[in-house]
């Protein structure tokens, strides 16, 4: 599942897309600037698509900056001209840029019109998206030959089945996000929580330094929990939920991911969403913390006593009683037989 970023195309860009679909342009280069899709370059056709391809595409690709390229073929389908969609994400580009472009790819395809896109090509080096690379891609689609590294990465993006292998003090990039290192004091606070020495730990992402840091460990009762949820920024919360259930006293650790809607920047929303799973993986595997429930909320007002109880102990659906097998019609069951015991039979004879 890819995350949506909220980035959209302006009306000017949509007009350019419309002209492009009608065949005016051979190529469009699209970038993300100020949280909007912008057309950085557009070129009319010069020759056949094969002769235009490398001279048009390759000079536009920067070594450290992702972008999208839409390249028009000469063939048409029922909707019009067919296009190649190129997602350029060089190895040396910034992690946040890679994440942003990966998460916005589906939006761009929708804005342009997915029915016009014949092929998708993903590349980290220019050889992947050159004309030769595109032809290799077509060959791989028509045969079971092994995929190139870039093709395998695109396949993994599409099926969203990337496994993570992360540690506490390293930053690890995955196709679904980034596992930022956890600061020492944050990790120690989580250790104390797992030993029941704390009952609340709040973590935040230091976006500038790309680190998960400690924000709050104030002793927190259930009634005070809503007050701990910021209204203007995202946070991770680990709460020791002390309660009774069916006569038993329980202490359950609950993870709460609070994200106050679109008051946060796109980058902040993406980072918190991407770092969540690797953080929980560290907590559960390395600290052996048993996180009973994982909850996502927009604001603290949702955290009532009833809400938290129902999340930790969801109500079971009542078991439906199966219908008894109906009896057959009385007239077709034959003569009713009366079976008597031996004593009854002798009494009747006398």
UniProtKB/Swiss-Prot annotation:
The modification Phosphoserine is found at residues 143, 277. Its main location: cytoplasm. Residues 2-139, 175-313 form the ADF-H domain. The modification Phosphotyrosine is found at residue 309. It is found in: Cytoplasm; Cytoplasm, Cytoskeleton. The modification N-acetylserine is found at residue 2. The keyword Glycosyltransferase does not apply. SMART domains: ADF. One of its GO terms (cellular component) is ruffle membrane. One of its GO terms (molecular function) is ATP binding. InterPro entries: ADF-H, ADF-H/Gelsolin-like_dom_sf, Twinfilin. Transmembrane segments: none annotated. Belongs to the actin-binding proteins ADF family. Twinfilin subfamily. Interacts with G-actin; ADP-actin form and capping protein (CP). May also be able to interact with TWF2 and phosphoinositides, PI(4,5)P2. When bound to PI(4,5)P2, it is down-regulated. Interacts with ACTG1. This is Twinfilin-1. It comes from Rattus norvegicus (Rat).
């Amino acid at each position: 599942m890819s995350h949506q970023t909220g980035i959209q195309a302006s009306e000017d860009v949509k007009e350019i897309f419309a002209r492009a679909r009608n065949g005016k342009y051979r190529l469009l280069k699209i970038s993300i600037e100020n949280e909007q899709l912008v057309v950085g370059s557009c070129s009319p056709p010069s020759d056949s698509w094969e002769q235009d391809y490398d001279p048009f595409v390759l000079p536009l690709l920067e070594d450290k900056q992702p972008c999208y390229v839409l390249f028009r073929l000469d063939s048409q389908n029922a909707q019009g001209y067919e296009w190649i969609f190129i997602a350029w994400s060089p190895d040396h580009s910034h992690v946040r840029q890679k994440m942003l472009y990966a998460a916005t790819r589906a939006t761009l395809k929708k804005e342009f019109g997915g029915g016009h896109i014949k092929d998708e090509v993903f590349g980290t080096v220019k050889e992947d998206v050159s004309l030769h690379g595109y032809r290799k891609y077509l060959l791989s689609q028509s045969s079971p030959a092994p995929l190139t590294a870039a093709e395998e990465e695109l396949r993994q993006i599409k099926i969203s089945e990337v496994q993570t292998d992360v540690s506490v003090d390293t930053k690890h990039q995955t196709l679904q996000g980034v596992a930022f290192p956890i600061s020492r004091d944050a990790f120690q606070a989580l250790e104390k929580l797992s030993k029941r020495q704390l009952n609340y730990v709040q973590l935040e992402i230091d976006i500038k330094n790309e680190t998960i840091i400690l924000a709050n460990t104030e002793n927190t009762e259930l009634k005070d929990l809503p007050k701990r949820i910021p209204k203007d920024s995202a946070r991770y919360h680990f709460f020791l939920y002390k309660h009774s259930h069916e006569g038993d006293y329980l202490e359950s650790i609950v993870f709460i991911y609070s994200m106050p809607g679109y008051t946060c920047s796109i980058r902040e929303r993406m980072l918190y969403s991407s770092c969540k799973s690797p953080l929980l993986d560290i907590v559960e595997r390395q600290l052996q913390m048993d996180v009973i429930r994982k909850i996502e909320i927009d604001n603290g007002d949702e955290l009532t006593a009833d809400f938290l109880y129902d999340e930790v102990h969801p109500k079971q659906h009542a078991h439906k009683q199966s219908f008894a097998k109906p009896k057959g019609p009385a007239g077709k069951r034959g003569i009713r037989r009366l079976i008597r015991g031996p004593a009854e039979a002798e009494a009747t004879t006398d």
